[in-house]
Structure formats: structure tokens, C-alpha cells
């Protein structure tokens, strides 16, 4: 196993960004990471693209990374899409690390890109339901409602402040 080094990082500011899409958010973060690493797109051997919710928000499925990265000029290299709920970005990073440590690539890029906020906040929150066992979701809702009441809350987190 070879030693692996993180040679560059990049990120976008946190925000709602109603006017932006996953492509533009990913491009901003990737540009910063490549500049930080002093690496060009042509130096990449592979990309691990982590995204969990784009299919629910925009309908883009199966080739999320290929679509986002092609718009940025990255193509004709292996692009692996990964989804692992809240650990999606960490999973992309782990897979990139494995690729380099195992000698399969010299330069691997890990990307975690999400566009979660949408104007329809009811739909936005419903999107999270699919991250649970759909066969028992009603039982889970009842259980959580009872637990919330035990701690002085209201059903659905009624006294939780909203930031949007």
C-alpha cells in the first residue's frame, strides 16, 4: 500500500443558492481544489463523485457525476458515482484514497456535491423520507412523535426554530 497525500481542497460557501445548480457548485469547488493542488484537469486519473439527493431535486439519475463534470470539461476518465446518504462525500473520499493507495491511480479527485434547498420547502423535507425504511416509515413517524412529546416537544418538532 502506498502513502496517500491530500494535495488540494476546495469548497463553496454554505448557502441556499436557489439560482445555482449542482454543476456550478461542483465546478467552483473543483476549480479551487485543482488550483490549491497545482494540478490541471488533464492530470486526473479518475473522479469519485458523491451525490445523494440530485435525483429527487432535479430528476437527474445514474450519471450525475458525468453530467456535472462534463460541463466543467472533465471527461474521458473513469468517473464513479457514489451515494451513501449522509456519508456520501466521505465515501467518495475513501474510494479516491483506495484508488491511490492501491496503485490504481496517481491523482484521484473526490467530489461531494449537493443542491438541497428548493423553494418548495415541503417537498424539500419530504425528499429526506426516502432515506428511511419506506416499509415502516409510518411506524417510525409515530415513534418519533411520541418521543418528541416525552421531551416537551410537539409532533413534527413544532417548537423547533426554522432558519429558512
What do these predicted ranges mean?
Residues 31-45:
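Phosphate/pyrophosphate-binding loops at sites that engage ATP/ADP/AMP, CoA/4′-phosphopantetheine
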Residues 8-9, 51:
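Pocket-edge structural micro-motifs
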Residues 158-164:
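Short, intrinsically disordered, charge-balanced linker/junction segments flanking boundaries
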Residues 155:
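Extended interaction regions within the primary functional domain
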Residues 10-33:
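N-terminal phosphate-binding or glycine-rich loops at protein starts, especially the Walker A/P-loop
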Residues 2-5, 14-17, 54-107, 111, ...:
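Conserved catalytic cysteine-centered active-site region
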Residues 2, 20, 24-27, 43-49, ...:
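Metallocofactor- and cofactor-centric catalytic cores in central/energy metabolism, strongly enriched
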Amino acid at each position: 500500500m502506498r502513502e496517500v497525500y491530500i494535495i488540494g481542497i476546495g469548497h463553496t460557501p454554505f448557502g441556499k443558492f436557489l439560482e445555482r445548480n449542482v454543476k456550478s457548485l461542483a465546478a467552483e469547488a473543483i476549480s479551487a481544489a485543482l488550483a490549491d493542488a497545482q494540478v490541471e484537469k488533464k492530470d486526473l486519473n479518475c473522479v469519485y463523485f458523491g451525490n445523494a439527493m440530485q435525483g429527487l431535486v432535479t430528476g437527474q439519475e445514474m450519471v450525475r457525476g458525468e453530467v456535472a463534470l462534463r460541463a466543467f470539461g472533465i471527461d474521458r476518465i473513469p468517473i464513479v458515482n457514489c451515494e451513501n446518504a449522509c456519508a456520501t462525500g466521505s465515501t467518495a473520499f475513501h474510494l479516491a484514497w483506495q484508488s491511490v493507495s492501491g496503485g490504481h491511480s496517481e491523482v484521484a479527485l473526490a467530489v461531494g456535491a449537493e443542491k438541497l434547498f428548493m423553494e418548495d420547502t415541503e417537498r424539500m423535507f419530504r425528499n429526506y423520507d426516502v432515506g428511511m425504511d419506506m416499509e415502516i416509515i409510518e411506524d417510525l413517524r409515530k415513534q418519533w412523535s411520541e418521543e418528541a412529546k416525552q421531551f416537551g416537544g410537539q409532533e413534527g418538532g413544532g417548537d423547533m426554530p426554522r432558519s429558512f
